């Protein structure tokens, strides 16, 4: 028996209890994993563990006799359908679940453009000038917590033709955690806590740069000259929480840590404004947030409004005199609760400042390189070729990535060349951000 998602909550789903059924959906686990014997399945992909529908009729709880390989996209399952009487649990369960074998026509059609590309296109990266505008590469987040060691950054960048990455510390890390399936603020920070945390994280970032021979860029001229033969970093912070309402700390980060790219918010509504994944408390951007934007404009720091609400973005656009960046997201055509994706009007607000929107390779939305390239194409069609960039969130995604290594960038470049000219592809993979960096730093 084949079930469809619009059957849930209807008599057909109730009548299927005890029967063998088949259905397709997107898996969601509490923690990132390649296989599991217990997980949730949803009709639409979520960008992170936070994207769980509150409606108990909109999710299927899956139980398997052995771990199932989850893959990176839509999963076809068969099993015994059960209707749970537990009022506090999910209404529908799939027991004894197994993966339905076979290659779908859709998957084959999605991958087929790469089969037709000439060998030179597959082998050629952007041209050695690619820039990733949002990254946590090098195992930076775990190392900041004292876990593990740095992983290779420079060599994969050279292999893939990536000249520069905006390498970000995570300023609110000590105060966020996975709660109820969502990354959320877990407590208020202690006075001075996030400043001290960020200071140590900046130290780790600089240590990684020294260890792997990665120059830290401080001027637009340096970025203009950057090439993949000698990969480099731009110091970034995901969240301005380390400021703790003290504007002079922005000057300190600029001078001491070479901060040149600042994302205002992350996973806690902070002193600068509201975020997409929590209820609004500031009506968008705060007066302090506006002050930080003005100071960034004066000093020469790129302003990144990723994670901020649409109200925050509108107010930021009214304040800034320089282009805004929204470093990692993708386009959605409908409002979604707590999503990190953005609606067309949100994207247009960034483009209207002359800014750039980074497309991230979340496999729930883009299960392969060809689909990822289509994400670039859809955004470019909406806002124009000059306002789209590469924002991989390398080693920061809670799930798999369609671009797991910088060494894979030639595949993305080849897929983009199936949709864009060589010059347009170069803009998408770095040229547009280079323009914004130049405009911001002078």
Task: List each model region and its residues.
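OB-fold and OB-like single-stranded nucleic-acid-recognition modules
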Residues: 1-107, 112, 122, 366-369
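Short, well-ordered secondary-structure micro-motifs
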Residues: 52, 316, 336-339, 369-370, ...
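N-terminal signal peptide c-region/cleavage motif recognized by signal peptidases
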Residues: 118-120
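Extended, charged catalytic domains and RNA/DNA-binding interfaces, predominantly
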Residues: 122-360, 364-366, 376-380, 387, ...
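Conserved active-site loop/cleft motifs that coordinate metal ions or position small ligands
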Residues: 166, 388-391, 426-429
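Short acidic/histidine-rich active-site segments
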Residues: 360-361, 383-403
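Outer-membrane beta-barrel pore domains
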Residues: 369, 397-399, 416-419
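Mid-to-C-terminal alpha-helical segments outside catalytic/metal-binding sites
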Residues: 404-442
